[in-house]
Design a protein with these regions (language model features):
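Solvent-exposed loop/turn segments at secondary-structure junctions
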Residues: 123-127, 141-143, 172-173, 193-197, ...
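Sec-exported extracytoplasmic/periplasmic mature domains
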Residues: 106, 168-172, 192-195, 279-286, ...
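Extracellular S/T/G-rich loop segment that most often corresponds to the catalytic His/Ser-adjacent loop
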Residues: 353-437
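Protease zymogen maturation seam
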Residues: 31-115, 129-130
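Secretory targeting and sorting signals
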Residues: 1-38, 517-536
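Substrate-binding/access-modulating region of protease and related hydrolase catalytic domains
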Residues: 197-354, 416-419, 423
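C-terminal subdomain of the subtilisin-like protease fold in secreted/lumenal serine endopeptidases
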Residues: 439-542
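Subtilisin-like serine protease catalytic core
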Residues: 102-137, 149-270, 288, 361, ...
Length: 544
């Protein structure tokens, strides 16, 4: 395959996919510190959202934007550029033993999530060929797509496609190591926000900013030495985070992940339309799982304080859970306006993140790094449910016409890994789809409880903390563990028809023929290193 450069309009801002080393099985997650763990009841604390009233309901879906937005930056593009071959398999796949989990589901149901739909509420999803036509339009709440495309199937930002790829991409190429968690599942795409659009000034004043992304960047994790020929050492965040400057001269930081903030000035997307979309999915039974790698972060101002948009989302996720939809959300990333919850009292956080705040009905996902530790950018909180890989991410190149992958972006001329809780959440959403395939009689809340109960619990009181919740997900355990109440919940085994392609009998010998069937064991006999070419990406970003 050839590598391409993906361009997003602004000179000096680019994203590039480069070399990634093949990784073996990594160590389990390090034990979290004893401080800042959940302590007793949260009643009356800032960490607990005010309960819904009986009459609270989500807003009625209007099917489109609640404001008039205008494109300010051209969509992600590709152009012929460098050609870089890599030896590669994403570390997160090995860490989570996804191949083994997929084999279990396939043997039981005949597919790997083929009877499931996952709704992706994000920046839209490009119909990449590795989806094999399994992406359908949910709607567009930003603007009418270019060239008459169906709503939700344009990804100007290059974020939603990467999220959806982790859930359901299927390269169908043995030379490619990357694969989605549920590669037979269908994606229902809703474009709900975009940093390439802004409110049209002629249509009214902009929405006050309540959660800006960070202004800094971060260095790639140690050991990531893959660079494009003649490239610089990565020192900047992916452009989604607003890090870096042309020429890479801006001050960089190393504790930030990808932020997709709602209600940020100069971008498109509000909590109101997020709530509308959640209701749309629940009312129309559009999907059994929702992934939201978008959030709204604000300062915690005291017990009982909740904003109108937050209340609408709270009502919407309750509405969806009551109608048997599993709701998965990214826990959020540290930014200049979303400080880490590292205060002494875990029940009085500095930052409140929506939708994760509503943990009674949402499975919130924190991020770990490739060493098994908590990613520094992952926002802590009593609402964190589980954790999953969120660094050195590899997924589909979102540029229109691309047939490859991306694992790095460039801001200010410097390559940086794709990372964030945005990309940890789809691992969990994919596992939720597999659990729904294996256990079709479980309702949405029972699916969440199974994922939490089978996670790798941290060494903390009650088996959970504010960093990784109940722990890093364990897909194999989520699919196979015997839990109370499991009788009758497991999908019936799918009969397997064996083809009788035996050679003709040897009439000249009376010696019995013994046919030995060799199966795969639980151990890894050898690591097959795949060799393929990554795509490079360039993203347009406006100067600030």
């Amino acid at each position: 395959m050839h590598a391409f450069r993906r361009r997003l309009g602004l000179p000096g801002r680019a994203g590039v996919a480069v070399l990634v080393a093949g990784l073996g099985v990594l160590s389990p997650i390090a034990a979290a510190p004893a401080s800042a763990q959940t302590a007793g009841t949260l009643a009356g604390t800032w960490a607990t959202p005010p309960p819904l009233s009986p009459g609270d309901s989500p807003p009625t879906d209007t099917g489109g934007p609640d404001k008039t937005y205008k494109k300010k930056t051209e969509c992600v593009q590709r152009s012929l550029g460098q050609n870089v071959e890599i030896n590669f398999r994403p570390w997160g796949q090995d860490y989570l033993q996804l191949q083994k989990a997929q084999d279990i589901v396939r043997a039981t149901t005949g597919s790997v999530g083929g009877n499931q739909k996952v709704a992706v509420i994000d920046t839209g999803v490009t119909p990449h060929p590795w989806f094999q036509g399994r992406v359908e339009s949910g709607g567009d709440y930003v603007a009418n797509p270019d060239n008459g495309q169906p709503g939700g199937l344009q990804d100007c930002d290059g974020h939603g496609t990467e999220v959806a790829g982790i859930i359901a991409a299927n390269p169908q190429d043995p030379k490619v190591g990357f694969i989605g968690v549920a590669p037979d599942a269908r994606i229902v795409s809703y474009r709900q926000l975009s940093e390439n659009y802004a409110e049209d000034d002629s249509a009214g004043a902009g929405t006050p900013s309540t959660g800006q992304p960070p202004s800094g960047g971060n260095k790639p994790p140690a050991g990531n030495t893959g660079q494009p020929p003649g490239g610089n050492t990565g020192t900047a965040l992916p452009p989604e985070n607003g890090g870096g400057a042309p020429g890479g001269t801006a001050k960089q930081q190393n504790d930030k992940g990808d932020n997709r903030q709602l209600q940020k000035k100069g971008t498109a997307g509000t909590l109101h339309t997020l709530a509308q979309i959640i209701r749309n999915i629940a009312d129309g039974h559009r999907a059994g799982v929702i992934n939201m790698s978008v959030d709204h972060c604000r300062a915690a101002t005291g017990p009982g304080d909740i904003q109108t948009g937050e209340r609408e989302v709270q009502a919407a996720v309750r509405y969806a859970a009551d109608r048997d939809v599993v709701v998965v959300a990214a826990a959020g990333n540290v930014s200049d306006s979303c400080p880490q919850n590292d205060q002494a009292d875990p029940n009085k956080p500095k930052s409140i993140v929506t939708p994760p705040w509503f943990s009674d009905d949402v499975l919130s996902v924190g991020a770990i790094d490739d060493g098994g530790g908590v990613a520094s950018f992952s926002v802590h909180g009593p609402w964190v449910g589980v954790a999953a890989p969120g660094t050195k991410i590899v997924s589909l190149d979102p540029a229109v016409g691309s047939t490859g992958l991306a694992n790095l972006t460039i801001a200010g001329g410097n390559p940086s890994p794709i990372q964030g809780t945005s990309f940890a959440a789809p691992y969990v959403a994919g596992v939720a789809a597999l659990v729904r395939s294996m256990y079709p009689r479980l309702n949405a809340r029972e699916v969440i409880k199974r994922i939490e109960a089978t996670a790798q619990h941290p060494a903390a009181p009650g088996g959970r903390d504010n960093f990784v919740g109940y722990g890093v997900i364990d897909p194999v355990a989520a699919l196979t563990a015997n839990l109370p109440g499991d009788v009758g919940n497991l999908a019936p085994p799918k009969p397997v028809v064996q083809a009788a392609n035996l050679p003709p009998a040897d009439g000249g010998s009376s010696t019995p023929m013994i046919v030995a069937l060799a199966g795969t064991g639980g151990g890894l006999a050898a690591l097959i290193i795949t060799l393929f070419v990554m795509h490079t990406i360039r993203r347009n970003r406006p100067e600030h």
